[in-house]
A protein has these predicted regions:
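Substrate-binding/active-site clefts of carbohydrate-active enzymes
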Residues: 1-84, 106-112, 129-130, 152
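Active-site-proximal helices and loops of the catalytic beta/alpha 8
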Residues: 15, 88, 93-169
Length: 169
């Protein structure tokens, strides 16, 4: 941990050495004890009892953000623009669970602060996409993510790629 001054010093030193810094950002969810839950309770998906929820059973320790809220979009974009003053790009955790249109708007606005910023999406596997969609949730494919991101993990096409290189149909 450290201060913003410490982080600025770190990124300045990274840049002095001819390197770039990509920041990992998590915009699909927060921890259940995030100050955002207390200060912006309407920004989260909730069950009938009002409890924060996630569509992924294995992720019981998170609270999914609700991108149906315009104020959330601007808050998230403002934080990206703030970080873009110091970093050269973003690795976006669980990017497919955040609407591609959000990423498109975020990229447009960040470009004003950091032209040429690098955008890396952690994508998901095909079975995960199918599961989330079967639960009524949003989950983009790699091809949709490539509309906005420079680089993706390509999880959803990996099995097809392996079959191809191994000479299988």
């Amino acid at each position: 941990v450290g201060t913003m001054e410490d982080f600025k010093h770190l990124t300045d030193e990274i840049h002095k050495r001819g390197m770039q810094c990509i920041l990992d950002v998590v915009y699909n969810h927060t921890s259940p004890d995030s100050w955002l839950i207390e200060n912006h309770p309407d920004w989260f998906k909730r069950d009938a009892q009002g409890n924060t929820v996630t569509l992924v059973p294995d992720w019981s320790d998170i609270a999914d953000l609700d991108y149906g809220k315009e104020e959330l979009w601007q808050y998230q974009i403002d934080t990206l623009k703030m970080w873009a003053e110091m970093v050269d790009g973003f690795r976006c955790d669980v990017a497919p669970r955040v609407p591609v249109e959000f990423w498109r708007q975020a990229r447009r606005e960040v470009e004003q602060v950091r032209p040429g910023a690098i955008w890396l999406a952690e994508s998901t596997e095909k079975h995960f996409i199918k599961f989330i969609r079967s639960q009524g949730g949003y989950c983009a494919t790699d091809s949709q993510l490539y509309e906005v991101f420079d680089i993706c993990y390509d999880y959803d096409i990996w099995p097809s790629f392996l079959h191809y290189v191994k000479g299988k149909d």
